[in-house]
């Protein structure tokens, strides 16, 4: 059984009410819910929230919010693993259920990429969305002071960029695992992790008002709205 759980707390600080703030004409979380529904792989879609308005919004979109997330899992220090472990346990999911944690702030999500997750779990404990760095991280600089910078990897200074290893980072959109892994693992990297690569054009952090404005420009440019 494939289950989707979308964490969506009400107390975002840098962008107030971020999860239901209108993004290109719709509540932010609606884009993620629509993508999950369009993937056509989930038997049930749940939202884990502490907020009555978010609950009302998601119920109107045809997903379930059968429990209230505890206060101690709704602050700035709660981890994804802790939130998911609570949701999986509260829902009483079977250990072998395949569970996707889908972030509410994923308006660029491609349903076909989301659907790759269950297959990846045949050979991994977790499968997560990733995207490549736009520039070689081996050329990263450390700021020692206002008057001094230095290479973090000076041994790479003469290496051609095309010879440097391509590196990836967490795309911050979705995470797949068996229900048992969500409950017993200490982090998403506790075990074997598979990556599901996404195009850089479909990935954007949305943590500040500036991020939000840029994301809306990208979204409209891609013709997604």
Name each model feature, range by range.
Residues 48-49, 176, 206:
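Short beta-strand scaffold positions
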Residues 195-197, 202-225:
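Hydrophobic helical membrane-anchoring modules
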Residues 1-48:
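N-terminal glycine-rich phosphate-binding loop and ensuing alpha1 helix
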